[in-house]
């Protein structure tokens, strides 16, 4: 027996009375199991069908999904050959993608292709189950969050708590900013979030690294969204889940693709999937426009360093960061691409790797010529011996530009355009760029100027 499905299933919303602590729920350490089947056409075109019986197999579940959405599935035994929806058949003629069954084991993160007979699979034995249209070794959009919990079927959200600025920006970009009831104290974008935090209309739930579980619980949220690589976020969400509160842990922002996946996940978990896919399309279109501009111009492969300070031994963007991905998108090379994550590096490596451009991301300075001059004059001998210093190619991103560059959020296209303007001189020259950029960063954007998702 199947529950009534929808694009993202609308289930009965649990009305929370009093505090969340009073909800009758039994805490469990058992890994959550799949409650339905996912159909992923690629490009974030995804459908979900909830089931009541975890013993159902993926074949019968997909048949039910296709019946509900007036789709037609063509099978060769238990192998899915094609799916037709809205008079279009997938895969299209000449497309190398094929339908496969993908499974996400309980207690783990990541799809694996099923090599067994799909009819022998019990959906309830896995955290998530997906029929995905993929090419080669490509995988479907993640079906679980950063804690291995499937985020489909949560139902409509009406009260949201965000535990991080990047989460807040993503929630707002997917159209749900008006129902945020709690946020971390550093969430300041869009501007209306900062205003509501200052008046108490949105309750501060603490800092990024020390959110208050009690404060979050008292807000009776439908869903709490945090960052999966923050142990304190995971701890808070684990307690909330034990009391019946839906939670989503976003993946660390290690690439542009991960940011887009997070955007989809947030929208799907809140039942704002349509808006989230529209947001993703806008970001992708802008990134493609930037790519086209770079391809049409005389791009150069320069060496770039992104630093979080002017310290002699600074913290820099390593290879597994969205910032490094942005450098690559600008057709340049991150001199610390062999490092992992954001990492403190030895001072001697700065001159030895000799960056052509240095981008300092720091709110320790103001956005004036004097502040910039003070920053440059304070640089160590190691920094002064670089090509970037000799050629006057050291940029300062401060004030609002610091947030833009330091948050893996839906403003990633704006950061990418700004990066290209800094490191690809002569290509995007329709706006004159100063050496220090702050709250005025939008003044230097043309392709992505309206992609701040401020409303």
Functional labels for PLM-detected ranges:
Residues 212-221, 243, 345-354:
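Short helices/loops that flank or line small-molecule/ion binding pockets
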Residues 159-174, 275-333, 422, 434-454:
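Basic- and aromatic-lined ligand-binding clefts that recognize polyanionic substrates
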Residues 1-29, 153-157, 455:
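Short, low-complexity disordered leader/linker segments with a strong preference
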Residues 159-219, 223-233, 335:
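A short, structured surface patch at a secondary-structure boundary
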Residues 25-153:
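Ubiquitin-like/PB1-type beta-grasp interaction modules and other compact soluble beta-rich domains
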Residues 44-53, 113-116, 156-158, 203, ...:
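Second-shell loop/turn segments in exported
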Residues 184, 317-342, 362, 393-396:
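His/Asp/Glu-enriched short active-site or ligand-binding loop at hydrolase and phosphoryl-transfer sites
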